[in-house]
Structure formats: C-alpha cells, structure tokens
C-alpha cells in the first residue's frame, strides 16, 4: 500500500528521485523484476500523492548502452506517468547515461510534457524550463544534466591537477551562474506581469562537498578527476528555492541546507547499503518556500549480508531456510579455520531453497594465500583504482611520481566511462 502525504491546498507538489540504474546487475544477477516493481510503485505514489512535477536527477540507466529490457521498462513507465495526474516530467542525464540516447526521442516526449535534457546545449532555453498550468507560469526549472569534462573545460589534456580542479570548478560555477541569472530575470518578469513569485528549482548530478557516500560498493563512479567532493554548495545561487541532486545513493541534506538535497537511489545498489532506508522526496511549494517530506520506497528484494565465523554463518543461513526466506545474500567468512571448501558447503546447504548466495568471500583463505603468494589477487574484490595501485607497487614507483601517474590514469578512466559511444 502506497503511503499518502497530505497536500496543502493550492500547493505545487514536486517528486524528486534519481539514480535508478535500470539494468544494473548484482554480482551477475538480473534485477529487472525489482526495477519493474519500483516503477509501478512510483506511478502509484505519483497518483496517490497528487504529484504535479516529477524530477529524475540522472542515472536513469546503469550503462550508456542499456539493454532492450531496461529500455522497455523506461518507456513503459513514461507511458504510464503521461496518463497520470503528473503535469510535468523532467529527466536529466547522469554520468552513467548516454546523453544522445536519452535525447533521441525528446521531440516525441515533449508532446507528452516530458522534458529530457541529456546534454549541455548552446541554447540557454534548452536547460531553462518554464512550467505552465492553465496558461499561467507555475515554476522555473534550471535543468542541468551531468556536466562532462568537455562541457566545462576548454582543455582536456593532462594538465597539472590543481589547474584541472580549478578549471572544473570554474566551469561548473559559470554554467550554474549563467542559468541562475536568466532564471532570476524570468522570475522577475513573471512577477511584474502576474503579480506572483514562482519558485526556481535546479537539478544537478554531481558530488557536493560534505556529502556522505552510502557505501563503497554502490556502483558510483568518480565524476571529476581530483575534485571528488570538492564542488562547494555555494555554486547554487541563493535565489534557487530547491536543488534536486543525483549521483550519491544516500538520501541527505547538503551542508545542513534544507533546500539542497540528494534523494538517494530507490534501491540498494550493493550489499553495503543493506538496512538503509530508501526513499523519494516530496516537495510542496505554497509560495517559493519548499516543504520537504520523504516517502519510503518498499524493499522489493531482500538483501542480507552475513559476516563471521562458520558457526555464525551456518546459524544465520539455517534461520533463513527455516523461515522460507526469499533472499539474496553476501557471505563473508572471517573465522580462524581455512575452510577451503566453504563455497561448495554453502551452495550445498542452500540447494533447492529461495536463498541465493550471490557473493561468497573466504577472507581467511584469501589472506593466507596473500601471505604465501603476494602476487595472487582476487580481481573480484579490487576496483579499477586498486588494480592500478598494485601495478605501481609492483613497479616500485616512487611516492613523488605517483600523483601525476594517478591523475593521468583517472583521466583515462573518466574518458572511458563518460564517452558516449552513440555520439557521432
């Protein structure tokens, strides 16, 4: 049953969500059923709560080349929400999305009052949206997608780190400043004509300084080389009444500001997020002041993390089997015994049940192998950065040389992850 939040009379109601990552797998396991249930729930939440504006702040898909099934879920949802009470849908691209893929059907979607902003445009009006209801303006939206390096910096070569950080910050700040100035002028013009001050809402897909990452395995990627967490909240003009952010998967206020928010991902993207509430945000504007409430998203697939010795793991699994649980589990063995057949033992124990062990880590055996064979590494447990760190260690690279090499490597990674393969 979808919860219903009381809506003030004459208020403009906005629903803020982000980071769906449609098509994302968890240790190879498809999650389409979960995504489908979430999107069905979201349509119900929109209708039950009389939502006027839906904002999706980036990372609609998990990859730039989404599967046919992921695309089907996306377009089915848009078809459903177009028939709902929601008057306006605004979707901006995140760093996982292909800007050209999202933008491709925008002309058709415009006819359904669905505005898609996949990439930065030279035309300021493409990112500055004026929303109307009954032929009267009701809100201004500064709809900014993820700003790629080429959008905000003239140079993309291997500059020194400080110059790159400075140029990145200045590029982002300039982009928001330009849009904010136009939005404020538009707001004033509307006030003079209609004698009503309407709210200014901005979107962003970036990492603002002081924000807290939900976990190390939630699928987030570094956005800007060397500047992770260094984009200050001060880039948002004080005239902006609400900032709808995406990228970070934990719902939170930014810099203790009630009006600058990450809504977080609606589903746990990794076992590190187990037990953390997932939500979308409801924002009511009776004038230009936002009143923010959260709406909890149900858990559509139970995820469980079990860590400890064999006795603890065995007891926990037996309890799940006893309760006929339908759960996906991650098991981390940290006992004193080596237990080389741990994976086989667990698979046999769970055979025929609805408990699925997606990831089994034998930390004890792994550490023993590391002690006896330092070069034996489990790539499954290493990030791209960890692999490069191991290479630097193997080559005995000095501490003085490492920052420049890491900077170059991160630049290459960023280019790989943000290159739009559909762009001509």
Regions found by a protein language model. Name each.
Residues 83-89, 198, 258:
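A short helix->loop->beta-strand "cap" motif at the edges of active sites that frequently abuts
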Residues 15, 140-142, 279-281:
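Conserved beta-strand elements of the Class I
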Residues 66, 97-257:
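His/Asp/Glu-rich metal-coordinating catalytic cores
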Residues 19, 39, 59, 74, ...:
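Divalent metal-coordination and catalytic microenvironments
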Residues 1-79, 86, 202, 407, ...:
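N-terminal active-site segment of His-dependent metallophosphoesterases
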Residues 233-299:
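A conserved active-site cap/scaffold subdomain adjacent to cofactor or substrate pockets
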Residues 83-85, 234-239, 255, 321-324, ...:
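Short, conserved loop/helix-junction motifs that constitute active-site signature segments
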Residues 8, 48, 285-424:
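Accessory, non-catalytic peripheral segments of nucleic-acid enzymes
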């Amino acid at each position: 049953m979808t919860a219903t939040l009381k809506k003030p009379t004459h208020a403009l109601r906005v629903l803020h969500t982000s980071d769906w990552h449609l098509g994302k797998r968890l240790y190879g396991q498809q999650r389409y059923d979960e995504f489908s249930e979430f999107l069905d729930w979201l349509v119900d939440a929109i209708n039950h709560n009389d939502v006027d504006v839906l904002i999706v702040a980036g990372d609609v898909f998990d990859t730039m080349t989404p599967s046919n099934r992921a695309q089907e879920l996306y377009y089915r949802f848009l078809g459903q929400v177009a028939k709902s009470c929601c008057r306006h849908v605004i979707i901006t691209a995140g760093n996982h999305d292909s800007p050209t893929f999202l933008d491709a059907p925008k002309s058709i979607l415009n006819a359904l009052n669905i505005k898609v902003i996949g990439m930065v445009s030279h035309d300021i009006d493409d990112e500055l949206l004026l929303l109307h209801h009954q032929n009267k303006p009701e809100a201004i939206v500064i709809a900014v997608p993820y700003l790629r390096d080429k959008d905000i910096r003239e140079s993309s070569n291997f500059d020194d780190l400080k110059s790159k950080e400075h140029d990145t910050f200045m590029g982002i700040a300039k982009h928001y400043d330009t849009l904010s100035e136009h939005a404020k002028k538009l707001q004033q013009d509307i006030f003079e004509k209609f004698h009503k001050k309407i709210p200014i809402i901005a979107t962003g897909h970036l990492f603002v300084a002081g924000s807290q990452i939900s976990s190390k395995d939630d699928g987030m990627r570094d956005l800007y080389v060397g500047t992770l967490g260094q984009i200050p909240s001060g880039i948002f003009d004080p005239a902006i009444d609400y900032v709808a952010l995406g990228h970070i998967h934990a719902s939170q206020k930014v810099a203790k500001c009630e009006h600058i928010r990450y809504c977080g991902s609606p589903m746990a993207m990794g076992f590190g997020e187990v037990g953390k509430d997932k939500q979308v945000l409801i924002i009511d504007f009776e004038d230009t002041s936002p009143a923010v409430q959260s709406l909890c998203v149900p858990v559509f697939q139970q995820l469980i993390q079990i860590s400890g010795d064999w006795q603890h793991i065995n007891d926990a699994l037996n309890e799940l089997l006893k309760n006929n649980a339908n759960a996906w589990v991650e098991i981390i063995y940290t006992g004193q015994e080596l237990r080389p057949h741990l994976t086989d033992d667990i698979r046999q124990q769970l055979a025929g049940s609805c408990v699925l062990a997606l990831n089994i880590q034998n930390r004890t055996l792994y550490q023993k192998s590391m002690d006896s064979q330092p070069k034996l590494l489990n790539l499954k447990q290493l990030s791209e950065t960890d692999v490069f760190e191991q290479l630097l260690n193997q080559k005995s690279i000095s501490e003085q040389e490492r920052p420049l090499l890491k900077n170059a490597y991160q630049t290459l990674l960023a280019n790989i992850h943000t290159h739009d393969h559909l762009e001509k």
